[in-house]
Amino acid sequence: AASGENTIILDAGANATVSITPAKASLFPAPSDIVVLQAEIPERANAEALAWAHSFGARVLLNLAPARPTDPALMARTDILVVNETEAGLTLGMPAPASPMEAIGVARALRGLGPKHVMVTLGADGAAWASGSEAGHCPALTLGEAVDTTGAGDACVGALAAAMALGKPFDEAVADGIRAGSTAVLAPGAAPSYAALPRVTRA
């Protein structure tokens, strides 16, 4: 778009048939692992994957993108919830937050639905987060000229999950996610623009 934001067209196709059977047959999560789920597959598959991951003691990150009505029981059992500001508003049935301060309140409200940790991404305004009784705002980073925003959200989620798996506190993991997303926009494409973990994490 002229604003510099990307436009995404989704055709569910094979996503609608996703099953966790292959994962059950070949993957054995460790308690330190983070299993990442997202909303482009059936909620039934996500619910099964969450139960499977928890049976190994692993934690589950749900990236509720695109936003859709979600079973309260699934939300309550989610360890880490990641949404953008539009998805946050839709999930709560309210307008998207208009400022980082409003977004902190929204993150707290989403935390009240059950997830232990919540990140609300705000594009050029960084992200708001809530974890336990704490909440805050992580500013965006400008590392250079933005070339292509495609995949920035996925890079952010991946780095957040990796940082959590390494045992980082949630606010530091959010900062790593922001840095990964900010790095991803510096080059065209999705996966080719992703940076290796050492480049996006802070010691």
Regions inferred by a protein language model and the residue ranges of each:
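Short, conserved phosphate/pyrophosphate- and ester-handling motifs at nucleotide-, phospho-/glycolipid
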Residues: 2, 84, 153
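Beta-strand scaffold of nucleotide-dependent catalytic cores
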Residues: 8-11, 136-139, 160
